[in-house]
């Protein structure tokens, strides 16, 4: 028996070496991807006259208003599947015209059947003058449930999703109410749900120009788009794409300009 094990030892050594080589190759590729991504975001920040933040600073301005990576970390099932704590990654600050902007990534590793998978999101934040708290969300029509049956018009996704209905922390803190804004039946009401603590003020702000712009930018804006505590922000899945993120930033700024919103100072 000892001789058998001795004869098999070289084979086991080769197998172990192959496994080690595979892990090293994956690690090397991940490092190359990380470095390439960091370089691309740094080049974007430099081109905008901005800067990439140190890891200690890389936290969303709005983190206390909406927890980053909430879809992946909220609830018992999500917590049990987390292979690492949530972390904040590549984040850049810059000015776009008059506006102070922060774009930052967050991530969490989740356990899957064959190892781990990293989930990412990035958040776009703009500092603005104080506004009535508001959320604007696209309504998603169609689709099917887990049993393949069509979703009805009263399904939560067709009403803008759950997050848009959730009372913001600043409104809840003062015992405020959270209302859906009633718009006349038409293309805008079909595509968007808007909730706020001040429906009258929001209805006045949604001029025909604003409504037309929102319809034109329906897929260019993050959804939901939050207005709260001097910040306008939205979150999208996946990492920052340096080739496309400015289009989303400019879509938000275009909306603020049409609403007559003034720039604000970012939180310290």
Residue ranges with predicted function:
Residues 1, 20-23, 57, 174:
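Acidic, low-complexity intrinsically disordered regions
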Residues 19-44:
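Transmembrane-cytosolic junction motif
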Residues 12-20:
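Core hydrophobic alpha-helical transmembrane segments of single-pass membrane proteins
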Residues 40-268:
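Charged, low-complexity intrinsically disordered regions
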Residues 1-12:
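Feature marks short, highly hydrophobic, charge-poor N-terminal signal-anchor/signal peptide-like helices
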């Amino acid at each position: 028996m000892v001789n058998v094990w001795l004869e098999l030892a070289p084979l086991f050594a080769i197998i172990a070496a192959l496994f080690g080589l595979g892990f090293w190759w994956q690690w090397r590729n991940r490092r190359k991807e990380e470095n390439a991504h960091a370089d691309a975001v740094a080049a974007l920040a430099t081109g905008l006259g901005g800067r990439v933040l140190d890891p200690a600073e890389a936290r969303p301005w709005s983190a206390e208003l909406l927890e980053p990576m909430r879809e992946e970390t909220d609830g018992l099932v999500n917590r049990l599947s987390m292979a690492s704590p949530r972390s904040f990654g590549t984040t850049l600050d810059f000015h776009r015209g008059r506006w102070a902007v922060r774009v930052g990534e967050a991530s969490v590793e989740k356990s899957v059947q064959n190892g781990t998978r990293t989930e990412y999101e990035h958040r776009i934040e703009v500092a603005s003058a104080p506004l009535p708290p508001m959320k604007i969300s696209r309504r998603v029509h169609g689709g099917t449930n887990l049993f393949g049956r069509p979703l009805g018009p009263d399904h939560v996704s067709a009403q803008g999703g759950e997050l848009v209905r959730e009372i913001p922390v600043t409104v809840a803190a003062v015992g405020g109410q959270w209302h859906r804004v009633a718009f006349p039946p038409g293309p805008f009401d079909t595509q968007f749900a808007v909730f706020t603590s001040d429906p009258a003020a929001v209805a006045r702000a949604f001029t025909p120009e604003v409504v037309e712009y929102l319809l034109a930018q329906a897929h260019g804006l993050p959804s939901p788009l939050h207005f709260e505590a001097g910040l306008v922000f939205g979150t999208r899945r996946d990492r920052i794409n340096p080739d496309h993120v400015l289009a989303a930033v400019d879509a938000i700024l275009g909306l603020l300009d049409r609403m007559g919103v003034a720039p604000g100072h970012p939180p310290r």
